[in-house]
């Protein structure tokens, strides 16, 4: 069974963990629809990136009409 050869001190443990912090998100507004999106990513609301539509949006289906 593997066990540590030497005890890891609090200082060494904390120095190792110094780079593990999470970075807060920095959302930007989409120039096409105004929704918040991640920088350098396609907008999830409208599918635009760099003033072009790169992901076609599916037509919305009204479930109330199809149920009857």
From Swiss-Prot:
Q: Name one GO molecular function term.
A: structural constituent of ribosome
Gene Ontology cellular component list? large ribosomal subunit
Sequence similarity: Belongs to the bacterial ribosomal protein bL32 family.
The lineage, from the top, is: Bacteria, Pseudomonadati, Pseudomonadota, Alphaproteobacteria, Rhodobacterales
Query: What biological processes does GO assign it?
Result: translation
Q: Which InterPro entries match?
A: Ribosomal_bL32 (IPR002677), Ribosomal_bL32_bact (IPR044957), Ribosomal_zn-bd (IPR011332)
Q: Which HAMAP family match?
A: Ribosomal_bL32
Give the species.
Rhodobacter capsulatus
Name listed for the protein in its UniProt record: Large ribosomal subunit protein bL32
Q: Which UniProt keywords apply?
A: Ribonucleoprotein, Ribosomal protein
